[in-house]
């Protein structure tokens, strides 16, 4: 039960990172634009008073503010895309769903008189104190905030994952597959809006009561508890879920424009813009002292406690991790260096983090952030606005550094903790990050994860690879650490490997390898051993010379579709080349061209051809049909055979194959189009086997 819940929470946590990743850019625009309009700043830098400079400053501030004003919509889109493995259709569905949900709530609220229908009265209504309602994207509606966006995003993703391969009757074929998702999402969002009218008001009332009581009862204790829990969740990657309500939904503030703003971070940005006294930032400011000073001091303590022969190695590891923490506030590379080998140190660190939040609250210092508590955000939201006692972070940080340094050194010696550089000789194997070649790292990580076949789901956030594997026993955690992971967390079949800011790039490289788009720089194995390598062999160098008109016929009878309708991103994203797809109504596949057979996959589900004119074509029958290992497929050609248009290549038992694969949609891909060439579909609806003029290659 816990493992399943952890997997779900992990997915939601990484999905939240997509909209959150937008905020630093918006925050920079807002902070700099506001600072350029600050009266104290203008007195020092007189050129800022120029009308043109002030115009630019106003534009920058507005450009940043619009992002924070529309966070619910951004969360709806970001969460949907994140939970749908990056597919943009889910994002479109989320936009439609969010608009429909709000319009449906608005219609009811206007009809029953809760919100005035008269525009003048409605404008007055929103300038008064009605925090339960908001004018979102011009729609007078219930104030569901970021939670409303997240709910719609989850709904859109669930519907996408359920229906993106749906097949409808032929007369409704245009609306099949991914096109069906926005339709079903809009209907579901209409129902969701009506449900939210009933369930959300008491939920909102409870959230308001909780957040108000939390601050009024004992804000200092609340800040301490927040800091401890937020750090404690770092190993599980669930801290995003914990802090999101505090940053984006709890608490409220009425802006100068009369708008009700919710969430510690959003309120801080609004108060910066309004030029009022800062009251927000309690649940952000505490990060600066321990991220900029405390953890780097902990790194120094670990270095000083390392064995003399290991100090040079530890200096490199700890130095880079400490610098990363100081500049950017990314702390995982440093935290995970001692989390698993010395959990007691991490427990101490969590308490110190809570202490940092508590002290900054007692001093009433308010500094917001968009990314994390490093020097960059400290300058943008503390020093540049100059609206709070930002300088107090430095003495508090230095004091915390002393506590971290001596606290860590005492604990390491007292409990003989095996922090980096203090391992027993038997444990001191390869140095972290040492691999044969830099370009081999993603391959080595895949092997340490149990190879490609063991990867069920692959994703990443800012600091860690998040992998769901089929068999966790095949994962070599020690090897992952040797490859540079500062920590590896395992909960059931969910693996998190902490590679720091490189994680997202490594994920992309690993996805390329899994998709067969980046051949390993070493001798290839037999083509019979790996289907993925055979796909690579089909992808040739682009054509350099123009090809005259060739006879090209439909290889299958069925319904023709653009290749973007294929429910597989390798094909729909045109990663192997442009083309088209056919949803078969019968199981016979014929040659579309005159030429030769380049490749017949061992599983018989795909064939590569080359026309006499040099065009190379891949016919891939169905999606994930490789898993059938040839069952239901009969091949009538072999590699090197000459073929004519209409000659039989394959016969497929549709009744046997269809129930066992996600879709029968068959992509036909031109894998070596010249630069600038694209495939356009001339036919529509159903096409017959051997039918000519169904597609055209254009420049």
From Swiss-Prot:
**Protein known as:** PTS system glucose-specific EIICBA component
Induction: what does the entry report? Strongly induced by growth on glucose and glucosamine.
Organism name:
Bacillus subtilis (strain 168)
Which residues span the membrane?
16-36, 66-86, 89-109, 139-159, 180-200, 233-253, 283-303, 313-333, 338-358, 365-385, 388-408
Task: Write out the function statement from the record.
Answer: The phosphoenolpyruvate-dependent sugar phosphotransferase system (sugar PTS), a major carbohydrate active transport system, catalyzes the phosphorylation of incoming sugar substrates concomitantly with their translocation across the cell membrane. This system is involved in glucose transport. The system can also transport glucosamine.
What do mutants without this gene show?
Deletion of the gene reduces the growth rate on glucose but has no significant effect on growth on glucosamine. The gamP-ptsG double mutant grows slower on glucosamine. Deletion of the gene negatively influences the growth of the cells with maltose, N-acetylglucosamine, sucrose and trehalose.
Alphabetically ordered keywords of this record: Cell membrane, Kinase, Membrane, Phosphotransferase system, Sugar transport, Transferase, Transmembrane, Transmembrane helix, Transport
The record's section on InterPro entries has: Dup_hybrid_motif, Glu_permease_IIB, PTrfase_EIIB_Cys, PTS_EIIA_1_perm, PTS_EIIC, PTS_EIIC_1, PTS_Glucose_EIICBA, PTS_IIB_1
